[in-house]
């Protein structure tokens, strides 16, 4: 069995949501269910109806909610794949020594 020493990198996670969006709510619930496993992830939920949300939607060209932004890169818009999301977090978290 191989053993790796690594430090977990800090990851920025922004969910750009809109009021009444069921997929946004599903992502929030999913995130809450796995959040304890990812202490290195800084999660922020921003409403698209705020000035900050409007600026992010414009910057990342997000036309449907939720917009999932990971480390300042658009991961998905209008939906999300749980498995791909976790793979992305694992890839970004690992910093081999």
Language-model region placement:
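Non-catalytic, surface beta->alpha helical segment in thiol-disulfide oxidoreductase systems
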Residues: 70-97
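Glycine-/small-residue-rich active-site loops that bind phosphorylated ligands and cofactors
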Residues: 19-23, 49, 77
């Amino acid at each position: 069995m191989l053993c790796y020493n690594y430090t977990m990198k800090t990851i920025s996670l922004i969910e750009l949501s809109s009021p009444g969006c069921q997929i946004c709510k599903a992502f929030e619930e999913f995130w809450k269910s796995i959040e304890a496993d990812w202490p290195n992830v800084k999660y922020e939920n921003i409403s698209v109806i705020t000035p900050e949300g409007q600026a992010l939607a414009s910057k990342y060209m997000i036309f449907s909610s939720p917009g999932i932004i990971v480390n300042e890169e658009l991961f998905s818009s209008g939906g999300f794949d749980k498995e791909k999301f976790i793979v992305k977090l694992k890839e970004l978290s690992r910093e081999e020594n």
